[in-house]
Amino acid sequence: DRLTVVDDQIGTPTYTYDLARLLVDMIETENYGYYHATNEGGYISWYEFAVEIFRQAAAMGHPEYDAEHLTVVPVTTEEYGVSKAARPFNSRLDKSKLTEKGFQPLPDWQDALERYLKEIEF
């Protein structure tokens, strides 16, 4: 099988469970305001995220998702074609205010992805 995924849109995945825990922590303080929050672990493209999803799935005992059975092909947004949702090329966020106000950074997105795949019993 073959899957094409855009490689020129950059951001950081965010696990909703981790974000919800952060919101609970925020509610319990008086540090009101606007914050940017995403999982740690660096910026990646949608293509890189797809590759990691399938890598972790294969490592969890699903060989149908390994590189021998599934090819993930990087393409540009232009090559991919029209999408129903307009997406920014760069959706990186500055999260420095979180730590300045004493909040713990969210775990790495790779760890979050692994926890998510286990949660859904993938």
Give the residues covered by each predicted segment.
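Amphipathic terminal alpha-helices
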Residues: 99, 108-122
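Hydrophobic "lid"/C-terminal helical patch
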Residues: 23-27, 53, 113-117
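Conserved short-loop catalytic and cofactor-binding motifs
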Residues: 6-10, 37-41, 86, 100
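A hydrophobic C-terminal alpha-helical subdomain
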Residues: 78-99
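Residue-level signal for the nucleotide or nucleotide-sugar donor/cofactor binding architecture
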Residues: 11-14, 44, 93, 104-107
